[in-house]
C-alpha cells in the first residue's frame, strides 16, 4: 500500500489485496463456456419434441407447427435420399418464401446435402447461370419456378407435385 511505498504514484498502487483481486476477477467471473453447436435441423427436431403443437413457421397464410415442420422435412429428406444423391451433394432450392421453403432447407440438411438458395424473383437467365455454376445434383422447385430451369441438366424435383409420394415416406 501507500505506507510501504510512499514514493510510488497513486495510479500505480494496488487497490485490492491479492485475495480480493482473485475473488473479483476469477471467482465471480468464470470464463464463459462455449454453447453447444447444433445444426438448425437438429434444433428444429428438438423443438418438435419439446413443443410439437407450437407454431414453428407462418407465411403466406399458412402455419406449420414444429411437429408438422419436422414430419414434412423428414419425408422430403427420405425422398431425397431415395433419389440416390451422394452425401454432400449440392441441391438447389428455388421456392417462394412460404413454409415449403423451410421444409426444403431442413430436408436437404437432414439428407446430408448442401443447399444452394436460388431466389425465384431473379430473372430466369440469372437463375440458370447460378444453377449451372453451382453444379447442382438436384433442384427443388414448385410449379411456378420449374419453368426457370427447363434447360438445366440438374434433376428437377417439383415438391408441390410430390405430395402423394411424400405421404408414403417415413415421418422420422
Give the residues covered by each predicted segment.
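Carrier-protein-dependent adenylate-forming modules in NRPS/ANL systems
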Residues: 1-15, 30-172
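Intrinsically disordered, low-complexity acidic/polar and Pro/Ser/Thr-rich regulatory regions
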Residues: 16-23
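A structural boundary/capping signal
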Residues: 23, 28-29
Amino acid at each position: 500500500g501507500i505506507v510501504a511505498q510512499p514514493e510510488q504514484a497513486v495510479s500505480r498502487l494496488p487497490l485490492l489485496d491479492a485475495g480480493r483481486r482473485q475473488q473479483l476477477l476469477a471467482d465471480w467471473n468464470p470464463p464463459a463456456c462455449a454453447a453447444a453447436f447444433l445444426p438448425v435441423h437438429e434444433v428444429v427436431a428438438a423443438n418438435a419434441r419439446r413443443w410439437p403443437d407450437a407454431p414453428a413457421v407462418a407465411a403466406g397464410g399458412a402455419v406449420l407447427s414444429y411437429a408438422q415442420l419436422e414430419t414434412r422435412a423428414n419425408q422430403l429428406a427420405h425422398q431425397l435420399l431415395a433419389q440416390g444423391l451422394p452425401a454432400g451433394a449440392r441441391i438447389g432450392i428455388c421456392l417462394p418464401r412460404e413454409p415449403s421453403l423451410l421444409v426444403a432447407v431442413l430436408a436437404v440438411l437432414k439428407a446430408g446435402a448442401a443447399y444452394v438458395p436460388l431466389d425465384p424473383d431473379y430473372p430466369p437467365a440469372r437463375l440458370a447461370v447460378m444453377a449451372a455454376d453451382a453444379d447442382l445434383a438436384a433442384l427443388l422447385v414448385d410449379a411456378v419456378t420449374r419453368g426457370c430451369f427447363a434447360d438445366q441438366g440438374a434433376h428437377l424435383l417439383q415438391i408441390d407435385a410430390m405430395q402423394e409420394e411424400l405421404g408414403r415416406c417415413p415421418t422420422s
